[in-house]
Structures are given as C-alpha cells and as structure tokens.
Amino acid sequence: ANFAYHVSQFGFDSRVVSAVGNDELGDEILEIFREKQLKHQLERVNYPTGTVQVTLDNGGVPCYDIKEGVAWDNIPFTDDLKRLALSTRAVCFGSLAQRDEVSRATINRFLDTMPDMEGQLKIFDINLRQNFYTKEVLRESFRKCNVLKINDEELIIISRMFGYPGIDLQDKCWILLAKYNLKMLILTCGTNGSYVFTPGTVSFQETPKVPVADTVGAGDSFTAAFCSSVLKGKSIPEAHRLAVEVSAYVCTQSGAMPVLPEALRNRLND
C-alpha cells in the first residue's frame, strides 16, 4: 500500500492488490483507503485481516511481529486481477507476501500475465521478515523481476544463502545484476547512503541528515519515487536523487503515508 500511495502522489494511476477479512479490521482498512483516495483491488476472504505488531528500537528502526494464516496469505487470482495485469506498466512485489502458496501463485500469475512492453518495470523489493522466505521463492523472484531493491543487511543474508563470493557489497551487487540480467539493482545502506547499479554504471547518493520521527515506509517511498521518475523518463541519477529526498522527508514524518510537499511532487514535471 505504501508504494502504491506514493506512486499515486506523482500522478500515476496505481492499485493496491491484496486481501482483507470479513471483519472490523477489514472495514477499517477499506475506510483508510477511501480517506487516502487510494485505489485498490482488495478481495474479502474468509481469513482474518492481517496484523503486524510494530515496535521501534532506540534508533527509531521498526521491528515486526507478523501474524500468520491471514487474508493476505490467500489472495485469489480473479478475472479483474487478470485484466489489471494486462494493462500494468510497473509492479512492485515482495518476498513476504509469497510465504503462503496461494498468494505466491497469484503473484507469479500476475507477473506472467503482464504483456512485454518497452520500459516495463517488475520490481522485486525484498522484505526478509522473521523466517518467511526460502531460497526457492527468492530465486524465482530474481528470475521474474527486472529491478531488484535490497538493503545491505538483506544482501549479506542473500549472499550467504546463494554462496556469492567476495567481501565487498558492490561486488555482490554486480554478481546479482549479471546473473539475473537485471535492468537495475537498488542497494540501500541506511545512513551510509544508497546505490543504483545498471549494466556498466553505478550511481551513489549520500543519505541526508534529517530529524527522524520514524523510518516506517521510508524504503517504500524511496522505491516509489525512483520508479515514478524512471517511468517519466528521468535519468538514473535524477531518479536516484529524488528517491533519496522523498525517503528523507518520509523519515521526518510519523506514519508511512504522509502527504509529500508540493515541491517534491512537482519535481517530475520539471
């Protein structure tokens, strides 16, 4: 939802695809989406609406306790979803939503249904939470994406799982980029900056120093701003710069979906 919300702030027609339960929490989510004017394809299923307990450590970094056997583990592939896939230019998917075979199958069918078109983005934003990932799921997602978003901690875990050599994080990124024929690989390193790798080039941006309210949603806003910029035809350095600025702003706000300042929203029209 965070990614779709921020993409919509840059003028794109976005949709959240998921499932909620036939319960009060499901009603609340639908109401929040209405308030945010966030378009969606949320199926109501006979499972409880998903919940996550989020606590912040002393540095403001979120820790997650994600409940299992919930609605978003059971997203059905509907005719409406098939129609959406056929008209989608960019999609962002993660590893957490694939922990159950039902939603995993739906995500893969959606990716396979998307028609090949110039400039299309299939963004795999890895989110390694608790024990909700496997080597098999990660490998299949690497194969189906053309943009990989990963942070430095996740890169170390992936490197151990897949046996990628080398100490330097950049070396590992080049290996992933080449092995899976990616258009782009985005590596975020917290306060140590971020990188965007493309075949033969790398962009680096420092992380701005800002007063942090919390970091929930900052990574999603980074991905959304970057991909929106690329879809608008901006260069990789331009897209990277805006992504860093948007993410920094979100860190100064409480909650994952603040309204972005007009100056940031209008940058893609320059």
Segments (PLM) and residue ranges:
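Conserved beta-alpha-beta core of the PfkB/ribokinase-like small-molecule kinase fold
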Residues: 90, 94-171, 193
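Structural alpha-helical scaffold elements that stabilize or flank donor/cofactor-binding regions
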Residues: 83-84, 140-141, 178
